[in-house]
């Protein structure tokens, strides 16, 4: 933190995601692990506008494949729309448990409609379908929504392909706060600075980011409205202002302030008013996160002698220790479904992602890297995004909560860190 505060350069603000001239550090994705029992599915080629159809079907296939839960069955040269009769036995014989067919129709005003239908070839029934109005710039978004539909119908869980992620890229002396689709594509810069940017976190509605910027030569917490590019200061007290975390209703932020001495946890309204102290300890309390129901705040504290995860009521009160295995457990992140808690645990000198089942209190290390930090759950609680280091360079890794599915996201030049997975598509 002291090293970061010594950096003294000028900041450049990108007040809208569409601002031209800023380099976009596109993420590339590598699948390094898949689920044990993948669902075989075929996505047939969509007839209609050929260019648009290729974009949509390629996006759907890529989404399903990188999820680690699906095995793509070759469709050969098959191309038919959502209304064509389906020979379920034929596709079942080819090894496909499910099949999706659709079409892309272009209207005179330039807009397009992506239609599709999903079939269960084992039962010989339709699982429903949908139609999405789109245009040339939103074809991949339509593909993500189709993939979400397929994912939910075949797994029973909501898909997260239409969600977005935020992260910070450090390249050529610049810190770029960027937002991208969940697959790393369509990256756009929200803020560019020669000063560090850390701890981005999404508001529950996906419309705002809170983060810490060092542009004032000290850590200050901002809330940034993405649609307009406007932002305001939430916490700029004496000392350090850090680690913002949204309440589930989006009205408050838990923050860490050192204005009264040691770093302690406070809550503050999203407009910066209504400051209230939450923790009272002689140690350092930091990294707060609200539980899914908003009633509890999980945080890191060294009050017991070593960094461990604790929990306290959202309005304060007595804190209870949560982690007991090992001498170093930090960065707690409760799952959106309220069933588990992700955190970083040091095991034999390795900093790894661990997941605790909150009912049984059983802990499982789910990553195989050595320098993990900053975990962030997907909104369906299935995947966890972390920052880690490979070959001396910062990359992002997405790991399933059971450790079986792994993806790696990196940029061609530069370090990428501080990931935050956004909420469901609004």
Swiss-Prot record:
Superkingdom of origin: Bacteria
GO biological process: cell division; protein import
Protein localization: Periplasm
Record SUPFAM superfamilies: TolB, N-terminal domain (SSF52964), Tricorn protease N-terminal domain (SSF69304)
Residue ranges of coiled coil: none
Keywords from the named record: Cell cycle, Cell division, Periplasm, Signal
Signal peptide bounds: 1-25
InterPro entries reported in the protein's UniProt record: 6-blade_b-propeller_TolB-like (IPR011042), PD40 (IPR011659), Tol-Pal_TolB (IPR014167), TolB_N (IPR007195)
Gene Ontology CC annotations of this record: periplasmic space
HAMAP family (UniProt xref): TolB
UniProt family annotation: Belongs to the TolB family.
Subunit structure: The Tol-Pal system is composed of five core proteins: the inner membrane proteins TolA, TolQ and TolR, the periplasmic protein TolB and the outer membrane protein Pal. They form a network linking the inner and outer membranes and the peptidoglycan layer.
Function: Part of the Tol-Pal system, which plays a role in outer membrane invagination during cell division and is important for maintaining outer membrane integrity.
Name of the protein in question: Tol-Pal system protein TolB
Organism (species): Dechloromonas aromatica (strain RCB)
């Amino acid at each position: 933190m002291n090293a970061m505060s010594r950096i003294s350069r000028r900041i450049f603000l990108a007040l809208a995601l569409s601002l031209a001239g800023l380099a976009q550090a596109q993420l590339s994705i590598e699948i390094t692990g898949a689920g044990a029992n993948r669902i075989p599915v075929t996505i047939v080629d969509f007839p209609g506008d050929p260019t648009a159809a290729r974009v949509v079907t390629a996006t759907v296939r890529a989404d399903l494949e990188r999820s680690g839960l699906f095995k793509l069955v070759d469709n050969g040269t098959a191309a038919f729309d959502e209304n064509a009769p389906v020979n379920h036995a034929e596709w079942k014989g080819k090894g496909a448990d499910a099949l999706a067919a659709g079409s892309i129709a272009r209207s005179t005003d330039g807009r397009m409609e992506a239609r599709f239908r999903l079939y269960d070839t084992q039962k010989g029934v339709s699982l429903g379908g949908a139609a999405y109005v789109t245009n040339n710039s939103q074809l991949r978004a339509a593909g993500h929504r189709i993939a979400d539909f397929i994912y939910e119908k075949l797994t029973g869980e909501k898909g997260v392909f239409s969600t977005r992620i935020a992260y910070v890229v450090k390249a050529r002396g610049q810190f770029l706060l960027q937002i991208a689709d969940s697959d790393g594509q369509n990256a756009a810069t929200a803020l560019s600075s020669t000063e560090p940017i850390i701890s981005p976190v999404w508001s529950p509605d996906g419309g705002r980011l809170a983060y810490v910027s060092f542009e004032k030569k000290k850590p200050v917490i901002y809330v940034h409205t993405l649609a307009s590019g406007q932002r305001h200061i939430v916490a700029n007290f004496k000392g350090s202002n850090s680690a913002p975390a949204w309440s589930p209703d989006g009205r408050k932020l838990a923050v860490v302030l050192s204005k009264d001495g040691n770093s302690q946890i406070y809550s503050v309204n999203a407009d910066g008013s209504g400051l209230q102290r939450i923790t009272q300890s002689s140690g350092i309390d930091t990294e707060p996160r609200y539980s899914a129901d908003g009633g509890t705040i999980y945080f890191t504290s060294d009050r017991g002698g070593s960094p461990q995860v604790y929990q306290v009521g959202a309005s304060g009160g007595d804190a209870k220790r949560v982690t007991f295995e090992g001498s170093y457990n930090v960065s707690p992140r409760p799952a959106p479904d309220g069933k588990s808690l992700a955190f970083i645990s040091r095991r034999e000198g390795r900093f790894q992602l661990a997941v605790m089942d909150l009912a049984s209190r059983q802990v499982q290390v789910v990553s195989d890297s050595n320098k993990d930090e900053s975990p962030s759950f997907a909104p369906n609680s299935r995947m966890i995004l972390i920052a880690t280091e490979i070959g001396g360079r910062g990359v992002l890794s997405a790991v399933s909560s059971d450790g079986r599915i792994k993806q790696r996201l990196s940029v061609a030049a530069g370090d990428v860190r501080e990931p935050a997975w956004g909420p469901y598509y609004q």
